[in-house]
Amino acid sequence: PACDKQLKTGACVGKRCLSPKPCKNLRVTHEDYLALLRKLRALPNVKKVFIRSGLRFDYMMLDDDPSFLRELVEHHVSGQLRVAPEHASDAVLMTMGKPPISVFKRFAAAFKRATKKAGLKQYLVAYLMSSHPGATLADAVELAEFVRDMGYNPEQVQDFYPTPSTISTCMYYTGLDPRTMEPIYAAKTPHEKAMQRALIQYRNPKNRKLVELSLIHI
């Protein structure tokens, strides 16, 4: 359970543990996860146990105990760790239920320090998404600047695709944020979705024309 309250009464209605900010009742610990990884490492004939993705970096940043990040870097990363900041615009991240981009930057810095201390060469691969409800071309430019500043060169970018029973899909089809009932923009034409994606992959020469059109359009 995320907290003692959830253990007794179940999940809170209309609330998220980590969004828009971490709940004060949230129990932050990686002890069980770390204990499992240590047991796996101790198994005979097991040389390595790699974690490729699936970690919540915002949750990791709430943990005052550095043991998990240290052991993750030392034993469980095979060169690259895939994480999901998804966007760089705080407004878009809010619609996604994700933390501000500053949290990811703190995690990236902590990962880099831990990697250097371990004497290893390991890198973060950022999972990014274009055209999520709430994202405009201006937001895509902000994401492109983040990609530039972090030294990333994303070969793949996930374009938002509506799937059933998600808040994001509700936003996409209704044009409303169901949590606030405020109007929300969603890119729907193939052309604008392509422009947002091209801005993120602006280093690709094939995207030059779309990037120019995007900047003119803004």
List the predicted regions and their residue ranges.
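Conserved SAM/AdoMet-binding glycine-rich loop
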Residues: P1-V125, S130-P133
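Radical SAM enzyme [4Fe-4S]-AdoMet core and its adjacent flexible, acidic
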Residues: C3-E31, M94-M96, P100-S102, R148, ...
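Catalytic cores of glycan-processing enzymes that make or break glycosidic bonds
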Residues: R52, L143, G175-L176
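Structural recognition of alpha->loop->beta junctions
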Residues: L69-S78, E145-Q158
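Catalytic cores of alpha/beta
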Residues: P133-R148
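S-adenosyl-L-methionine
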Residues: T136, Q158-D159
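Alpha/beta catalytic cores of nucleotide-metabolism and tRNA/nucleoside-modifying enzymes
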Residues: T180-S214
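Conserved small/polar residues in nucleotide/adenosyl-binding loops
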Residues: I216-I218
